[in-house]
Amino acid sequence: EIASGDWSSDVCSSDLFKSVKINTVLSRYWTDDEVKSLLQYVEKWPVVWRFIEYMPFQGDAFHGPTFDEWKAQLERVSGGPLTEVHSIYGFGPATYLALPSGKAVGFIFSMSHSYCDTCNRVRLTSDGQMRLCLLRDDEADLVSLVRNGATAEALAEHIERALQRKQERHDGIGMDKPERPMWRIGG
């Protein structure tokens, strides 16, 4: 039903949501015409639109585009430079720039622009592992502690020690790719 109707105005104008964020994973194969079509939606909908760099998993290779390539295409297609936005849209990893129209869009380019030093994210996988970074296979086993009756204090100490293993930087586009598929990590 979602694909067959114009549900966006109902959802986006609803009082149920403080803000709606739409994440779009980028492809290096998008033509300027396709990007223009996408920008029409970005301009039309009262949402926070974020562009996410492709992240390879299970040994897959990086397929771009990088932040600089995507920014150049957006500037070319939208007719002008993107400008820095100082407003904050949450506490996540996105950097926000404004299109020439003034509409702010977010960028999450974890491969070509490391933000590890300010990352405040971890994920709890469906099998009870706390994943410290999407781009690394480093995980902390929480489920074993819980199943073995660990106290809340012991669990908190384990989590704190694990968080200290978070890296300040990753190795960039050429780094080893995580082996766990995204569908097993959760999002």
Where are these regions (language model features)?
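Extracellular/lumenal ectodomain signal focusing on beta-strand-rich modules
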Residues: 10-11, 51, 121, 132
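Active-site oxyanion/phosphate-handling segment shared across diverse enzymes
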Residues: 99-127
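Flexible mid-to-C-terminal extensions adjoining Fe-S/redox cofactors in radical SAM and related proteins
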Residues: 117-187
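Radical SAM enzyme [4Fe-4S]-AdoMet core and its adjacent flexible, acidic
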Residues: 16-106, 110, 144
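Single conserved hydrophobic/aromatic residue that forms the stacking wall/gate
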Residues: 1-11
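Small/polar loops that bind or transfer phosphate-bearing groups
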Residues: 4, 26, 134
